[in-house]
Amino acid sequence: MVLAVDLLNPSPASEARKHKLKTLVPAPRSFFMDVKCPGCFTITTVFSHAQTVVICQGCTTVLCQPTGGKARLTEGCSFRRK
């Protein structure tokens, strides 16, 4: 019996659609990012799934707020993945 799908060599597109625990090689989906404050342009390192409010050290502006999963960036903040 021949399978239509190769289970040992899945395509990257099919691996991206799977749940994080069902992938062939488990990998985390969280990351650290550099967030730039829109007011004073200070860069702060923030975890993508932060569970507390992150405030800018320079001007005390809220950079991101926690949700149930990923943290929501404040409007106007730009970020870069590390």
Curated annotation (Swiss-Prot):
<keyword id="KW-0862">Zinc</keyword>
<dbReference type="GO" id="GO:0008270">
    <property type="term" value="F:zinc ion binding"/>
</dbReference>
<keyword id="KW-0687">Ribonucleoprotein</keyword>
<comment type="subunit">
    <text>Component of the small ribosomal subunit (SSU). Mature N.crassa ribosomes consist of a small (40S) and a large (60S) subunit. The 40S small subunit contains 1 molecule of ribosomal RNA (18S rRNA) and at least 32 different proteins. The large 60S subunit contains 3 rRNA molecules (26S, 5.8S and 5S rRNA) and at least 42 different proteins.</text>
</comment>
<keyword id="KW-0863">Zinc-finger</keyword>
<dbReference type="GO" id="GO:0003735">
    <property type="term" value="F:structural constituent of ribosome"/>
</dbReference>
<comment type="function">
    <text>Component of the ribosome, a large ribonucleoprotein complex responsible for the synthesis of proteins in the cell. The small ribosomal subunit (SSU) binds messenger RNAs (mRNAs) and translates the encoded message by selecting cognate aminoacyl-transfer RNA (tRNA) molecules. The large subunit (LSU) contains the ribosomal catalytic site termed the peptidyl transferase center (PTC), which catalyzes the formation of peptide bonds, thereby polymerizing the amino acids delivered by tRNAs into a polypeptide chain.</text>
</comment>
<keyword id="KW-0479">Metal-binding</keyword>
<dbReference type="InterPro" id="IPR023407">
    <property type="entry name" value="Ribosomal_eS27_Zn-bd_dom_sf"/>
</dbReference>
<dbReference type="GO" id="GO:0022627">
    <property type="term" value="C:cytosolic small ribosomal subunit"/>
</dbReference>
<protein>
    <recommendedName>
        <fullName>Small ribosomal subunit protein eS27</fullName>
    </recommendedName>
</protein>
<keyword id="KW-0963">Cytoplasm</keyword>
<keyword id="KW-0689">Ribosomal protein</keyword>
<dbReference type="InterPro" id="IPR011332">
    <property type="entry name" value="Ribosomal_zn-bd"/>
</dbReference>
<dbReference type="GO" id="GO:0003723">
    <property type="term" value="F:RNA binding"/>
</dbReference>
<dbReference type="GO" id="GO:0006412">
    <property type="term" value="P:translation"/>
</dbReference>
<dbReference type="InterPro" id="IPR000592">
    <property type="entry name" value="Ribosomal_eS27"/>
</dbReference>
<dbReference type="Pfam" id="PF01667">
    <property type="entry name" value="Ribosomal_S27e"/>
</dbReference>
<comment type="similarity">
    <text>Belongs to the eukaryotic ribosomal protein eS27 family.</text>
</comment>
<feature type="zinc finger region" description="C4-type">
    <location>
        <begin position="37"/>
        <end position="59"/>
    </location>
</feature>
<dbReference type="GO" id="GO:0000028">
    <property type="term" value="P:ribosomal small subunit assembly"/>
</dbReference>
